[in-house]
Design a protein with these regions (language model features):
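Active-site helix of classical SDR
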Residues: 62, 98, 106
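C-terminal helical subdomain
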Residues: 122, 145-185, 192-194
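Residue(s) in the substrate-gating loop at a strand-loop-helix junction
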Residues: 82
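The beta1-alpha1 cofactor-binding region of Rossmann-like NAD(H)/NADP(H)-dependent oxidoreductases
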Residues: 1-12, 44, 168
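Substrate-binding pocket helix/loop in short-chain dehydrogenase/reductase
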Residues: 37-39, 43-48, 155
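Short, small/polar-rich loop/turn modules that mediate ligand/substrate recognition or access, typified
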Residues: 114, 119, 185-187
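Short C-terminal tail/terminal secondary-structure segment
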Residues: 33-36, 87, 175, 186-205
């Protein structure tokens, strides 16, 4: 499904609600790394494509979900931002911009939807173990003329725990935010990043 197609997203939610009997939780977890290049070399098509996947899809899913969440008497929305949406990320301007925007979107809709008992939060993961971070490492290494291992070691060294995040740490926080234990948490951006202190400079002088 094209997550940037408003009509397709709306139809998907209508079908899902019909099949499941309602909707009380939305987790926006679609994303794309986008191009790895200096800002002056990023094409407009690349910028728009990255925004469509990372930001517009989140907006459209929220827009489609809200009527169903209201009908249910409330619920929880959790969107995936990134540590890049907190520190920035050299050579990844479209991705970082989209992830910063998700924080702003989350805080705005939390203000709008709180009266409907719909809580809206986002998670800002650091490097999460898995195939996706491996592709990010490979792209960054190629752009900087370095080995994959050196990039991986550098990224791990930027965390106080000196390790990447297990995927189960992300899912555990989602479960918490969507449960009654998270009932008073709204409009927040929560970091799960092994104590990340920043992505650092793009290159060493």
């Amino acid at each position: 499904m094209d997550m940037g197609d408003s009509a397709a997203v709306t139809t998907f939610f209508e079908q899902a609600v019909s099949h499941l009997g309602g909707l009380d939780i939305l987790v926006n977890n679609v994303g794309s790394a986008g191009p790895t290049a200096p800002v002056e070399e990023v094409g407009l098509d690349e910028w728009n494509a990255c925004m469509a996947v990372n930001l517009t899809s989140t907006f459209l899913c929220i827009q489609a979900a809200v009527p169903h969440l209201r009908a249910a008497g409330g619920g929880s929305i959790v969107s995936m931002s990134s540590a890049a949406g907190k520190f920035g990320f050299p050579l990844r301007s479209p991705y970082a911009s989209a992830k910063w925007a998700i924080v702003g979107l989350t805080r705005t809709i939390a203000l709008e939807l709180g009266r409907d008992h719909i809580r809206c939060n986002c998670i800002q993961p650091g490097p999460v173990e898995g195939e996706r971070i491996s592709r990010v490492i490979q792209a960054k290494a190629a752009a900087e003329g370095r080995s994959d291992n050196s990039v991986r070691d550098q990224m791990a060294a930027m965390t106080t725990l000196r390790r990447f995040v297990p995927p189960t740490d992300i899912s555990a926080l989602i479960l918490f935010l969507c449960s009654d234990y998270g009932a008073s948490i709204n409009g927040q951006s929560l970091s799960v990043d092994s104590g990340m202190e920043g992505y650092g400079p793009a290159t060493d002088d």
